[in-house]
Amino acid sequence: MTEIRRIQDADVAGKRVLVRVDFNVPMKDGQVTDATRLEAALPTIEYLTEAGAKVVLLAHFGRPKGAVVPEMSLEAVCQPLADLLGDAVYFSTVTSGEDAVAATMDLEAGEVLLIENTRFAAGEETNDPGFAAALAELGDLYVNDAFSAAHRAHASTEGITHHLPSYAGLALQREIDHLVAALESPKRPVIALVGGAKVSTKIDLLQNLVKKVDTLFVGGGMANTLLHAQGIKVGSSLCETDLVDTARAIFAAAEESGCKLMLPTDVVLAKEFKPNPETRLAAVTDVEDNEMILDCGPATVVALGQAIDRSATLIWNGPLGAFETPPFDAATVEAAKYAARAAVEGELIAVAGGGDTVSALNQAGVSGDFTFISTAGGAFLEWMEGKTLPGIAAVMGTPELVA
């Protein structure tokens, strides 16, 4: 992979540095209820202020669709961010234009200005060249620190980079460095755990992973489709019968590349999908027509643990069962605890990502034990699919514009 341009390589002293951050935080009644994403931006902001930069923050919040929606104003973020920084955060009520430019010009070295929600402008999500140019007037150079938005070619993530020297912030660097280490140049053997409801949402992911990992375990509802393609009856389970050919192509690709493809061998069954119904543990070949597969069984988890023991790197995306409904969280929780223990006590590099995955690891109480957890949903998935992310491509290679 081409090297990314890092903010440490730029001369930022006295310059207006535009930083694209992810401040799409949970809010209730105008109050930030979870400051995790604000905290993630602190290292880059503090690095720049200490280096004497004038920091101008760009972010989106919600989906206002190009209109000014007062409830989606980023002004509510200013005080929580100021509290975390221990310093004032100024706010521009407009996203671009003379007043916004004037606000950036008024900054002293080491001060921070937050620009209003970029999605209040219709040109943000359409990557309008005119709006991108207007945003570029707010700074002398640009830093992307929002991996979670890097898969979107928007004005504040891609268009702006055609006007300013562009670099990766510290949080973005951390994401990329860990993902490159896990997928592009990993310690081998590599095992990937992929779960979730539908194969259709992760076809590209599976097709990319079988070419890059040594072992691929598929769980969750996705596994039902692969089992069905092998001629195994899955009863009334969620199953995409129209994807049999796709599933068989994945098996063939795995065999061709020498990737061992693992599926559940025993399963937890129920006739109703509800919390704590009557369940039955059975071999995967012993599913009745009126039963649903809702989790992997204990023998499968043991086999998965043994496969993890044989691996040096683990990549995890998606739960292994219907984890949000007990008791069908058991396999996911047990596998997560096993992987976490291997990461803490052994030398396993354990990387996970995706919204459901993060929730599952939090539920298992092991988030802090994984080597790295990406909170980016779509961007993490697209990276794992081997796709080029516009926001990343924009900060790679030799800069066309030099600060």
UniProtKB/Swiss-Prot annotation:
Cellular location(s): Cytoplasm
Amino acids binding ATP: K202, E324, G354, G355, D356, T357
Keyword Nucleotide-binding: yes
PROSITE patterns xrefs: PGLYCERATE_KINASE
Alphabetical UniProt keywords: ATP-binding, Cytoplasm, Glycolysis, Kinase, Nucleotide-binding, Transferase
UniProt binding sites for substrate: D22, F23, N24, R37, H60, F61, G62, R63, R119, R152
GO CC annotations on file: cytosol
GO MF terms held by the record: ADP binding; ATP binding; phosphoglycerate kinase activity
TM region positions: none
Superkingdom of origin organism: Bacteria
Reactions catalysed: (2R)-3-phosphoglycerate + ATP = (2R)-3-phospho-glyceroyl phosphate + ADP
EC number: 2.7.2.3
Pathway assigned in UniProt: Carbohydrate degradation; glycolysis; pyruvate from D-glyceraldehyde 3-phosphate: step 2/5
Predominant cellular place of this UniProt entry's protein: cytoplasm
GO biological process: gluconeogenesis; glycolytic process
PANTHER family recorded: PHOSPHOGLYCERATE KINASE, PHOSPHOGLYCERATE KINASE 1, CHLOROPLASTIC-RELATED
Family membership: Belongs to the phosphoglycerate kinase family.
Subunit structure as annotated in this protein's UniProt entry: Monomer.
Stated name of the protein: Phosphoglycerate kinase
Natural source organism: Maricaulis maris (strain MCS10)
Lineage: Bacteria, Pseudomonadati, Pseudomonadota, Alphaproteobacteria, Maricaulales
